[in-house]
Curated annotation (Swiss-Prot):
This is Bacterial deubiquitinase-like protein BilC. Its EC number is 3.4.19.-. InterPro entries: JAB_dom_prok. It comes from Collimonas sp. (strain OK412). Pfam families: Prok-JAB. Belongs to the M67B family. GO terms for molecular function: metal ion binding; metallopeptidase activity; ubiquitin-like protein peptidase activity.
Amino acid sequence: MNFSIKATIRAWSAPEHKLACRKQLWRKIVAELERRGKRRHEAGTFLLGIERNGRKEVQSAVYYDDLDPSAYDSGVCILHGDAFAKLWSHCREKGLTVVADVHTHPGAGFQSDSDRTNPMVARQGHIAIILPNFARWPIRQGNLGIYEYCGQHEWLERSPAHAPNFFYTGFWS
């Protein structure tokens, strides 16, 4: 018999989650976004990982300004076309896929009109997470803006108030 104790406990403790990130990795990503944004402008990253049994598991991150050094020049996150070529090349090298993107906002973690009409990855099922207050820690899970792309500039809100178990950052990720 082949089974994983971790997978069994995770299925019991967070049965409905669709996106998971280890707690230590999530904290590191948030801290790095705060550092890169300098508490003055937006910063962002692509979360890379794998999809398994309908769940996306974050394993690493690639920050927007590593792909495009001018990504934050306007104060908001803007990536130019060649940044995506670098991203897809990196994914191929690592055998990973983009499972979500995360970026910061100055106030609340909500999806702006610009976010809604310009998805970073315009693929059905893509997840966008918005961190409030330029990622200043601590950030309560309930303050995250989480959205799942449906195509045609339509999104489903997956924020904790609407889908409390969608994003899991606990020990069993």
